[in-house]
């Protein structure tokens, strides 16, 4: 079923002109989820169309474009719950594989948390085989990137908390950010992890990006401490710089939760977060006018604080962030997924923020289909080849998958 959505539009700050409307048509797919923990858009079968891959609590599945036929490629192979995955050709056979994080038990920081990878055959619709990588309690997020610029991608894994930490502050040990180089034989292994950062706490997500424009990958990491930038030094060590304080006024949850970097017109950029952890604020950081402070020696820590703008506080449990050019202008809109209803007038769902004067914190806000998806995760991509970026949201309490077809011209 699909329908044309009327968007509720409000403005954050004072904007000089009315922002162009974004028209979306929603389509709820037949697939029903237990919890849609994660979603990715990628071509699973080589037909040059983006399919929808989803992590469900006990399944990994993909929905085939254009009819969204459901293919379950893993069920019951991992310890419940599956919580994250990352696509990459791990074994070099030219077909996509997935690293998978499972045995999700957020209240247990001492045991559990499995890391594995699954691989399929020539027919990606048939069940895939599973191979272990390692374990760490509270495995939560993962992705692939070539961090050392050797032409090979590494698996980056972020647990949510440090091993053996306890509520409410989870402060006994830091949360390690783990990097697994792919071994020569990824089936037999061993997969040997490297720790590149372990002095932050409760790291809910990260993004690999090139924030310095030097064609070197950096990592943006959100935690109780706020927003950190991790940069690889020539010796191979990593330096952490605090660039955003997060929300330090709330307790025990504090800092920042989700993160994405977006593009502004004129070559600028912004960093978007949810604050505090599992929080009620949509926040954007813009680059400061002053030059970045220079450090005198390798490994030295220092702050490079960006300007913090709170765009929205009328939400409960923001849980997904994406940046995409939805209207064909020169900047990327900020897309936020809200997981819970705060009130009858402030519901879960997808929200879009369009920069009007980002440096001054002026953005327009559009509410898309309020109350329809308790958004656990979302992704953006052109699903029908019309040149417009569409949105896909997966739900927790709503157990659903919805496409928002972009009708912008």
Predicted regions and their residues:
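N-terminal secretory signal peptides that target proteins for export/translocation
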Residues: 1-2
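Bacterial N-terminal signal peptides
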Residues: 6-16
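Beta-propeller-forming repeat regions
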Residues: 18-409
């Amino acid at each position: 079923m699909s329908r044309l959505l009327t968007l509720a539009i409000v403005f954050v700050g004072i904007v000089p002109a009315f922002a162009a409307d974004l028209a979306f048509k929603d389509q709820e797919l037949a697939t029903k989820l237990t919890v849609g923990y994660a979603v990715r858009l990628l071509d699973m079968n080589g037909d040059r169309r983006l399919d929808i891959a989803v992590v469900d609590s006990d399944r990994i599945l993909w929905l085939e474009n254009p009819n969204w036929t459901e293919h379950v490629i893993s069920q019951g192979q991992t310890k419940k719950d599956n919580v994250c995955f990352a696509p990459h050709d791990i074994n070099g056979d030219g077909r996509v594989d997935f690293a998978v994080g499972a045995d999700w038990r957020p209240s247990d920081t001492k045991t559990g948390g499995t890391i594995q990878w699954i691989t399929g055959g020539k027919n990606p619709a048939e069940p895939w085989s599973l191979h272990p990588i390692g374990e760490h309690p509270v495995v939560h997020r993962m992705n692939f990137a070539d961090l050392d610029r050797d032409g090979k991608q590494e698996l980056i894994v972020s647990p949510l908390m440090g091993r053996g930490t306890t509520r409410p502050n989870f402060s006994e040990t830091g949360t390690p950010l783990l990097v697994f180089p792919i071994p020569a034989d990824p089936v037999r292994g061993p997969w040997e992890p490297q720790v590149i950062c372990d002095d932050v706490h409760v790291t809910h997500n990260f993004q690999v990006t090139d924030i310095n424009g030097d064609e070197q990958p950096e990592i943006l990491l959100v935690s109780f401490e706020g927003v950190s930038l991790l940069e690889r030094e020539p010796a191979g060590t990593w330096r952490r710089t605090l660039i955003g304080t997060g929300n330090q006024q709330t307790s025990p949850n504090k800092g920042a939760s989700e993160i994405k970097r977006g593009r502004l017109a004129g070559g600028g950029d912004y960093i978007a977060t949810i604050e505090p952890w599992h929080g009620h604020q949509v926040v954007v950081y813009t680059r400061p006018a002053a030059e970045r402070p220079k450090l005198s020696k390798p490994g030295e820590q220092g702050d490079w604080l960006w300007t913090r703008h709170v765009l929205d506080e009328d939400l409960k449990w923001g849980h997904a962030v994406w940046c995409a050019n939805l209207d064909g202008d020169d900047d990327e809109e900020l897309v936020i997924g809200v997981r819970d209803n705060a009130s009858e007038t402030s519901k879960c769902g997808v929200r879009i923020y369009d920069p009007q004067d980002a440096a001054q914190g002026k953005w327009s806000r559009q509410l898309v289909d309020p109350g329809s998806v308790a958004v656990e995760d979302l992704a953006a991509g052109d699903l029908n080849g019309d040149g417009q970026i569409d949105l896909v949201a997966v739900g927790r309490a709503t157990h659903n998958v919805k496409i928002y077809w972009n009708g912008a011209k």
